[in-house]
Amino acid sequence: TEGIDLWGECYSIKNTTALGWPPFIPDSVTSFPEELFSLVNLTTLSINYTNISGAIPPQIGNLSNLIRLNLSSNYLSGEIPPEIGGLINLISLDLSSNHFSGEIPVELFGLINLKGEIEYITGPGGGASIFHQGLNLSNNTLTGSVSEEIGDLINLKSLDLSFNQLESDLPLELYSLDSLRSLNLSNNLFTGEISEEIGNLLKLEGITTYAHMSTTQYDALNLSNNLFSGFIPFEICDLPLDWEDSYMDENQGFNISNNQFCAPFPPCLVSFVGTQDTYNCTQMYNQNNFNMPLNYSLSQNHPNPFNPITTLRYELPEDSFVDVTVYDMLGNVINNLAHGNQNSGYKSVQWNATNNQGQPVSAGVYLYSIEAGDFRQTRKMILIK
């Protein structure tokens, strides 16, 4: 069949489906050969630890059958080409340890099949496991904020954006990625508070691989060395971490040190707070006064899923007439949990999975809503039995 020459080796255009590390690439090679992008049947492309530099050519978009793309640990620079966002079959994308700059192209968040996977290998020297990361853009010089479109990566098991110059608050959509097992946002310039919706990430337990006598740990949650501030929500204690293990931060990979978080901390974090810059905490205490919310809000119920009781929390910045109502998915009223005037403050009400007649309801998805003044908000919760 027709072939091309790459680095002194002949590759069939039709039959070459994998080009993996380590292909023999001379140190003198500093750019991708144009012929590489004619291997349109490639499903795996892994080129690492070379002297290849400069931008990734837009012709990378020709390789539409790629499932794994790993170009980590090279000298690549410039902006990440948006054409990578057209490689819709990708389940693993690793561009870490290069010199990429600019913002993360929003097109990457259209790669809805990204997830990451563990590959198990057997051989005469024993077994081993390799983790192909879902999305790894760490160790570059990326700037800007993380787009809300990141919430489209619903299958993602690992996300590593560490060691960049990313900034601004985290989008709420990030907390909807409930397939995540590893989240590393360390060593950036992220700001703002951590949302109580972090409690949705119920698979965030870290990933461990092994080879011979060694193991590699991919952090469960690493937020260290940023500019995060405010109070850490109690929902963080819902994460599937062994909080009773004094070495949990090492064994599972948990780190929130070197931020600007303020006390009081959730009880599960007592041993894992690390060093915090509390200079601005006094001002925050005065502003919040611990009793007066600044805005109306309705929190995610806790626990969720639940059986048989869950707590719904909400905040009232002023005295209000309040309705808190549970509905089924057809919009039928199930239970009126609150109906009347309430003073401002931090409020909560429990639902015991019964209707207005006191009868137990069936398992499933329910809606709960609050109406207070001109404020309206609705959330979902799951009853299991």
Question: Model-predicted segments: where are they?
Answer:
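Residue-level detector of functionally pivotal "anchor" positions at catalytic/ligand-binding pockets or at interdomain
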Residues: T1-E9, L111, Y279-H302, P317, ...
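N-terminal capping/linker segments that flank leucine-rich repeat
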Residues: T1-T43, Q260-Y285
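Hydrophobic anchor residues at the C-terminal helix/turn of individual leucine-rich repeat
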Residues: C10, E35-F37, I60-G61, I84-G85, ...
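Conserved hydrophobic beta-strand positions in leucine-rich repeat
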Residues: T17-P22, L45-I47, L69-L71, L93-L95, ...
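The feature encodes a structural signal of leucine-rich repeats
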Residues: F32-L36, S53-P58, I80-P82, I104-V106, ...
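Glycine-centered coil/turn sites that cap beta-strands in beta-rich domains
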Residues: Q287-H302, F306-Y327, N336-H339, S348-W351, ...
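C-terminal tail/sorting-segment detector
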Residues: S344, S348-Q350, Q359-K385
